[in-house]
Design a protein with these regions (language model features):
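Surface-exposed beta-loop interaction hotspot
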Residues: 1-33
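Short, ordered, surface-exposed loop/turn motifs in non-cytosolic proteins
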Residues: 24-26, 32-65
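Structured interaction patches on ligand/partner-binding surfaces of diverse proteins
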Residues: 1-8, 83-86, 94-134
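A glycine-anchored, Pro-Gly-centered beta-turn/N-cap motif
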Residues: 74-76, 84-88
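Acidic surface patches and DE-rich sequence motifs
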Residues: 32, 48, 59, 72-73, ...
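Short, acidic Ser/Thr/Gly-rich low-complexity loop/linker segments typical of extracellular
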Residues: 50-79, 105-107
Length: 134
């Protein structure tokens, strides 16, 4: 998905990030999928093998901020700028020691790639968000 340069730059400026136009943007969400539908998973730390370690997690309004160190239980989305074009890249979510993975087969320059990390009911009977997560 292509993203308007002005939209990308507005987000980057708000987060004090300098955008490299040769790189891409990755956005995603961490979910638990069960019989009753899907739920956000909070307190998940995202890592990946792209070389980009600056992950921005959403606040209660769904806007990415630089003050969170893991996903918000009320909006578990995340954002990475300057992910090198290429791939494939593996993204890992770690929720209190419970991990799940998803791959991004390709990241394109000046484009947005979505990566959904799913904890499924077959492996996790309940949402793995730890108690006390905020």
């Amino acid at each position: 998905i292509l993203i308007k340069e002005s939209s990308r730059d507005t987000l980057a400026t708000a987060l004090s990030v300098t955008v490299d136009p040769a790189d891409g943007l990755v956005i995603g969400v961490v979910l638990w999928s069960g019989g009753s539908g899907v739920e956000f998973v909070g307190c998940t730390e995202i890592t990946n093998d792209s070389g980009q370690s600056d992950v921005f997690y959403s606040d209660d309004t769904g806007y990415p901020v630089d003050s969170r160190t893991s996903t918000n239980p009320d909006n578990s989305s995340y954002l990475l700028f300057n992910v090198p074009a290429g791939g494939p890249y593996m993204f890992t979510g770690d929720t209190d020691g419970e991990t799940t993975e998803a791959d991004a087969p390709m990241v394109f320059a000046e484009a947005m790639t979505f990566v959904y990390l799913i904890y499924d009911e077959a492996t996790w009977a309940t949402n793995p968000t730890p108690g006390g997560c905020s």
